[in-house]
Regions:
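Bacterial N-terminal signal peptides that target proteins for export
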Residues: 1-12
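Short, low-complexity, disordered segments immediately C-terminal to signal peptides
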Residues: 10-17, 25-45
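A short, structured surface patch at a secondary-structure boundary
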Residues: 71-123
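Structured C-terminal subdomain patch of bacterial secreted/periplasmic proteins
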Residues: 265-339
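Extracytoplasmic substrate-binding proteins
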Residues: 142-145, 149-215, 312-339
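Basic- and aromatic-lined ligand-binding clefts that recognize polyanionic substrates
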Residues: 63-66, 71-78, 181-241, 245
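Proline-aspartate-enriched helix->loop->beta-strand connector
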Residues: 121-124, 128-134, 152, 262, ...
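Extracytoplasmic low-complexity, Pro/Thr/Ser/Ala/Gly-rich segments
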Residues: 34-80, 89-93, 325-339
Length: 339
C-alpha cells in the first residue's frame, strides 16, 4: 500500500509540474484563473460547528495542538505531526503516550502537555498553534473561550465525551484540509468492523453491558464510543442499559450505580473493566458472581490498562491495534453466554 501511494504522489507531482510549465506560457488572465482554482481547492477557509458555536480556520494549519482523547491519532493517521498533545497517564508507554501512538511519537517534535487537573494555557500558547483540535473532550465554555483566544479551537459538537469516532475523524480531517483522506480512513475502519461482525456471528443480537467495577461501579451509556463500536460489531445494548439511558437527563457518557443495582444491567455479555480490583476478586465477589453473564461464562473481564484504553479511546489508530487483543475474549464470552 505504501508503494502504491508513493506512485500516486509521484504521478500527481508530475501533473502539477506540467501544469505549472504550461501556465507559465499562458496569459496573466490564465494565471489568475489557475490561482483562484488553487485557492478554492485548498479547502480554506473552513467553518466547523461545535457545541459552543462556530470555528473558522482561514488557512491550512501547520502547528497543531490536540487536547482530550484521540485527536492526535487522527492527526498522525493523516500524515501530520502535532506540536503539542496530552501526556497519557492511564496505561502509558515509557514515553507517556498510548501504545498505538508509540511508533509515531517523536519527543523532539511534539511537546507532551500535562492536562490532568487543568489546561496549561501558557504552555499551549507558547507552542504558537495555528489550530487546537479537541473533538472528543468535555471542557466548559469558559475553557473553550480561553483556548479560542490562543488559536481557532475545534471543540466537540454535542455532549461531552460522546463524539463518535467517525465524527472525530471527519472534524480533524476538515480542520486540516484533508477531508477526503479522513473519509478514506473512516471507510477503512468501518470495513474492518464489518468484517469482524461477519466473522463473528456469535456477536449478533447478544445483549451487552460495558462497565467499570470495583470500589465504584460505572455503566457506559449508548452514546459512548466504546459502546457504539460493540454495537457496530453486532451486539445490542442490554435492556437495563437502555432503561438507565432514559434517566440520563444530563447526557453523560457513563452513570454511577450502586453495587446492589448492578444486577439491573445484567446482559448476555458483560465487558467488565476490573483493573482496580483484579479479575480474581471480581469473579469471587458474591454480588458480581451472581450475575447471569458471570455464571454462564459470558463475562469478559479486562485489567490490562493499555487494552482497556484501546477499547475506550476508539480511534482510527486504536481500533486496528486493539482488535486482535480483545476479539478472542469477546468471542469466548459471546459463545458461552446463554442469550
Amino acid at each position: 500500500m505504501s508503494w502504491s501511494r508513493t506512485r500516486v504522489v509521484s504521478a500527481v507531482t508530475a501533473v502539477l509540474l506540467a501544469t505549472t510549465t504550461l501556465a507559465a506560457c499562458g496569459s496573466d488572465g490564465d494565471k489568475q484563473a489557475e490561482s483562484s482554482a488553487g485557492t478554492a481547492s485548498s479547502g480554506f477557509p473552513v467553518t466547523l460547528k461545535n457545541t459552543f458555536g462556530d470555528t473558522t480556520i482561514t488557512k491550512k494549519p501547520e502547528r497543531i495542538v490536540t487536547l482530550g482523547w484521540n485527536a492526535q491519532d487522527v492527526v498522525y493517521a493523516l500524515g501530520e505531526t502535532p506540536v503539542g498533545m496530552p501526556k497519557v497517564t492511564y496505561g502509558p508507554t515509557a514515553d507517556g503516550v498510548t501504545a498505538w501512538d508509540a511508533d509515531k511519537f517523536d519527543k523532539s517534535k511534539t511537546t507532551l502537555l500535562d492536562t490532568g487537573d487543568k489546561y496549561p494555557f501558557e504552555k499551549i500558547a507558547a507552542l504558537k498553534p495555528d489550530v487546537i483540535l479537541a473533538p472528543y473532550e468535555g471542557f466548559d465554555e469558559a475553557t473553550y473561550k480561553t483556548l479560542s483566544g490562543i488559536a481557532p479551537t475545534v471543540a466537540y459538537p454535542g455532549a461531552p465525551w460522546q463524539t463518535t469516532w467517525q465524527d472525530q475523524t471527519l472534524l480533524v480531517g476538515e480542520a486540516l484540509g484533508k477531508k477526503a483522506d479522513a473519509e478514506k480512513l473512516i471507510t477503512g475502519i468501518s470495513d474492518k468492523i464489518k468484517q469482524v461482525a461477519a466473522e463473528h456471528p456469535e456477536f449478533k443480537d447478544k445483549t451487552i453491558t460495558v462497565g467499570s467495577f470495583g470500589a465504584e461501579n460505572y455503566v457506559y451509556m449508548p452514546g459512548d464510543p466504546r459502546v457504539q463500536i460493540l454495537n457496530e460489531m453486532g451486539f445490542k445494548n442490554a435492556p437495563g442499559v437502555e432503561a438507565l439511558e432514559k434517566t440520563n437527563t444530563k447526557k453523560e457518557f457513563s452513570l454511577t450505580i450502586s453495587k446492589e443495582k448492578v444486577a439491573d444491567v445484567d446482559a448476555d455479555v458483560l465487558v467488565a473493566y476490573v483493573d482496580g480490583i483484579g479479575t480474581q476478586k471480581f469473579l469471587a465477589d458474591p454480588v458480581y458472581s451472581s450475575l447471569k453473564a458471570v455464571k454462564s461464562g459470558g463475562v469478559y473481564a479486562m485489567q490490562d490498562q493499555q487494552v482497556i484504553s484501546g477499547m475506550s479511546a476508539v480511534s482510527v489508530l486504536s481500533v486496528p491495534w486493539v482488535l486482535d487483543k480483545v476479539l478472542p475474549g469477546l468471542s469466548k464470552a459471546a459463545s458461552a453466554s446463554k442469550g
